[in-house]
């Protein structure tokens, strides 16, 4: 079952988020995962409307995957953008129908709400990293940029 994220989902999402944190290369740039900080940031974003998203709930009523997006406007011409902040499925659920439905739910939301652009990302270290290029291209996306990060402290 795919449903909208509720503020009450933040603890469960933080648990999955920590798995992502450890699986990806994120920890090597940002340090240790802070579950309380992650929960607060997600809760605030959901409460003030800067974040929205969806969860995939399994037969045991546990969240198996989630997608968080942010609504934005382009600086150069105010075209509307729905930007993925985080899309994560437990490794055992990647490529499964429910995880893919999260993507399609977000895409449908962007179309139904007349967004001009839908931006998806990928982070190094995750086992599905190399597969995402071909998946996104099949869905009509084009690569725009790569980000580089330098740790300053």
Where are these regions (language model features)?
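A short, internal acetyl-CoA/4′-phosphopantetheine-binding micro-motif in the GNAT/acyltransferase core
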Residues: 85-96
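A short beta-loop-alpha structural element at the N-terminal edge
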Residues: 1-15
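Conserved beta-strand-loop-alpha-helix junction that forms the acyl-donor binding cleft
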Residues: 118-132, 151-152
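A short helix-loop-beta-strand connector motif used in the catalytic cores of GNAT acetyltransferases and
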Residues: 40-55
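Conserved acyl-CoA
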Residues: 101-117
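Conserved beta-strand in the GNAT
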Residues: 55, 61-71
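Conserved GNAT-fold acetyl-CoA-binding loop/helix
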Residues: 21-41
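A conserved beta-turn-beta hairpin within the catalytic core of GNAT-like acetyltransferases
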Residues: 73-84, 144
């Amino acid at each position: 079952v795919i449903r909208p994220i509720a503020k009450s989902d933040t603890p469960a999402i933080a648990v999955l988020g920590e798995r992502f944190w450890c699986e990806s290369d994120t920890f090597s740039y940002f340090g240790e995962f802070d579950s309380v900080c992650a929960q607060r940031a997600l809760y605030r974003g959901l409460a003030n409307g800067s974040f929205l998203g969806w969860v995939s709930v399994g037969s045991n009523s546990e969240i198996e995957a989630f997608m968080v997006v942010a609504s934005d406007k382009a600086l150069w011409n105010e075209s509307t953008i729905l930007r993925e902040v985080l899309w994560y499925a437990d490794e055992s659920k990647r490529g499964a129908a429910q995880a893919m439905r999260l993507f399609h739910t977000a895409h449908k939301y962007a179309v139904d709400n007349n967004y001009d652009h839908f931006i998806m990302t990928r982070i190094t270290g995750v086992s599905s990293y190399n597969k995402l290029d071909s998946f996104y291209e099949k869905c009509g996306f084009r690569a725009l940029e790569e980000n580089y990060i330098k740790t300053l402290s």
